Amino acid sequence: MKKRLQGTDLFTDSFIKHENQNYDQFLSEIENYKNKNSEWRTYIVQWVHQMKSSISSMRLALQNRKRSKENMQLLVELDQIDKQLNNILNLARLEAVYRDLKIEQINLSESINRIINQNKRLFIQNKVFPKVQIENTTSTVLSDKKWLDFIIDQLIHNAIKFSNPTDQIIFNIKQTDNKLCLDISDTGIGIIKEDIPRIFDLYFTGKNGRSNNNSSGIGLYLVKQILEQLGHKIKVESEQSKGTKFTIYFD
C-alpha cells in the first residue's frame, strides 16, 4: 500500500511540474500569437479551459485520498496553477473588462474575511496569519464585487508568496483625506528600491520573482489595470527585509 501511494504522489508531482513548464512556455508564446493574428484570445481561452479541466480532475482525485501533509501541499500547488491560468484568461479579456462591470455597494470587511477564508489552505500551508483592522469607519465602498475580490485575492497571494513562516498579513480599512482606503501589509522580505517603479509592469518579476521562481509578472499588472477601470487607485510602499504595503484608494 505504501509503495502504491508513493507512486501516485510521484505521478501527481510530475503532473504539476509538467503543467508549470507548459505555463512558462505558454507565456513566451502569448506575444507571438498577439502579433501574428487577431485569434490569439480564442487560442488562449481554449488552452486555459483544457488545462483547468485537467486540474479539476487531479484536484478531485487528491480530495478523495486520505488526508496528509503531502496531499495538502499538492492541493496548494494545484490551486496556484489554477490561479495562474485565471490570470492568463483575465489578461486575454482585459480590454473588455469594462463591459463586465457591475458597480454596487460592497461591504469591504465582509469581502476581506470571505477571501481570507477561501485562502485558508494557503495561509495554513505557509504558516502565515491574517489580521483584519477597521479604524472606526464605514467599510462600504462602490465597486465591482467580482473584480474587487480578484484584486484582494491577488494581493493576498503576492503577500503570502514573499512572507516567512509566522509572519502576519494585516488588512487595515481606514479613512485618508476623506477617502476610504484599504491597506494590505506584510512583514515579509520586502522589495528592493530599484524594482518598486516597475512592479505593475506586465511580465516584470523583479529580484524577488526571479529568486522565488514562482512569478509570472501578470498578477500585479492586472491589479493596476482593473483598478483603473474601476476608478480606484493603488500605491505601494516597501522596505527590504521589513515588508510591503499596498494601499487601495476608493474614490
Where are the model-predicted features located?
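Short helix-loop "hinge" at the ATP-lid/N-box region of the Bergerat-fold HATPase_c
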Residues: 159-160
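Conserved catalytic submotifs in the C-terminal HATPase_c
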Residues: 129-139
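Acidic ATP/Mg2+-coordinating residue in the GHKL
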Residues: 186
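Glycine-rich GHKL/ HATPase_c ATP-binding element in histidine kinases
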Residues: 242-246
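Short beta-strand/loop element within the Bergerat-fold HATPase_c
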Residues: 133, 166-178
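Short conserved segment of the HATPase_c
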Residues: 191-203
